[in-house]
Amino acid sequence: GKKSDHCGYYVHLQPDGSMLAGGSLCLPTNILKAVRQSIYDNIEEFVAIVEDPEFKKYFPVIGEDFLKTAPKGFPKDFKYIDYLKCKEYVCSYNVPDDFFTRPDMLEQIDKVFRQFKRFADFINYTIDDFE
């Protein structure tokens, strides 16, 4: 099938390395630039999502593989420049080894991914414009 640039959901099971995660990896340059522009243009909405205490409880860090400096076309002194330095817009929540054997596992996964969905919806809204 065709690779989607949209945020996806990911469940990883590994001894001492299990996690619930999601995001968009390896975005084409034009889409990555558009996502950054969307964050910049709608920073209040983005911050309301990623700095919400319920969101941060599961996802304290946004992104992977960061630029060392501000991306081209964005002011270096932008208060939230770190959100624009992401090359991969992903979030992950590490879980203990016994997580997947707990009786409330599905409810817990639902809680985590409900928080992630707000982030995914924000990113996917921009990506939708490219389809």
Label the model's feature ranges:
Residues G1-Y40:
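Aromatic- and glycine-enriched beta-alpha-beta binding-site module
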